[in-house]
Amino acid sequence: MGASARLLRAVIMGAPGSGKGTVSSRITTHFELKHLSSGDLLRDNMLRGTEIGVLAKAFIDQGKLIPDDVMTRLALHELKNLTQYSWLLDGFPRTLPQAEALDRAYQIDTVINLNVPFEVIKQRLTARWIHPASGRVYNIEFNPPKTVGIDDLTGEPLIQREDDKPETVIKRLKAYEDQTKPVLEYYQKKGVLETFSGTETNKVWPYVYAFLQTKVPQTSQKASVTP
């Protein structure tokens, strides 16, 4: 089956540590579509001091979640610049009201959901330790320091970011699940949800790749490259 000539409107979902960033990056390398990350968009608007950026920063500074209407305005404003392209939304929608607002503006064709067991994600995230002065990152499983808890170059102690501590990771994963469950159910009912389950990104990726080959053209310079 050949890729459809119609522009693709896609969303990618996955918990923190699910490999969503890696998969999104591979998708944009192999396929002709624009990747729109709500996190990058947010940082860019805050940096440029746009109206939405200033508004979002005020909520973040108070330790509050950015309201649905602000996130929706941010995403829809940017999507207006991408009407001629296929696109992949990453980090939006995160809540049911956001999904419904997006639906009123665009017909979503497919939602790629990366389903990685929480225990695997917990191991991935809690294995990360950093050397604060240099920003060097170690992973206890894939890239361990020569001496446990010590930076290879300076001999200084490594620390674990608050976000990477087991209790924080569990809270983040639970919050993600609570927030996105209604969104996944919403897309499931619409018949556009495609869930890819696995514990390793490299093993999940070929299935995502094969699925998208039927949906969107490949980039010409990468068309002959094996994923």
Curated annotation (Swiss-Prot):
UniProt-annotated binding residues for AMP: S38, R43, K64, G91, R94, Q98
Gene Ontology cellular component terms for the protein in this record: mitochondrial matrix
Source taxon at top rank: Eukaryota
Modified residues (N6-acetyllysine): K34, K64, K80, K174, K189, K203
Region described as LID: spans on this chain: 127-164
Reaction equations catalysed: a ribonucleoside 5'-triphosphate + AMP = a ribonucleoside 5'-diphosphate + ADP; GTP + AMP = GDP + ADP; ITP + AMP = IDP + ADP
Residues recorded with modification N6-succinyllysine: K20, K57, K64, K80, K174, K189
Residues modified as Phosphoserine: S37
Major subcellular site: mitochondrion
A biological process from GO: AMP metabolic process
Regions annotated as coiled coil: none
Alphabetically ordered keywords of this record: Acetylation, GTP-binding, Kinase, Mitochondrion, Nucleotide-binding, Phosphoprotein, Transferase
Pfam family, one: ADK
Keyword Mitochondrion appears in the UniProt entry: yes
Subcellular location field: Mitochondrion matrix
EC number: 2.7.4.10
Family: Belongs to the adenylate kinase family. AK3 subfamily.
Domain notes: Consists of three domains, a large central CORE domain and two small peripheral domains, NMPbind and LID, which undergo movements during catalysis. The LID domain closes over the site of phosphoryl transfer upon GTP binding. Assembling and dissambling the active center during each catalytic cycle provides an effective means to prevent GTP hydrolysis.
Assembly notes: Monomer.
Role this protein plays: Mitochondrial adenylate kinase with a specific GTP:AMP phosphotransferase activity. Could also use ITP as phosphate donor. Its physiological function is to recycle GTP into GDP which is necessary for the TCA cycle in the mitochondrial matrix.
Name under which the protein is recorded: GTP:AMP phosphotransferase AK3, mitochondrial
Organism annotation: Pongo abelii (Sumatran orangutan)
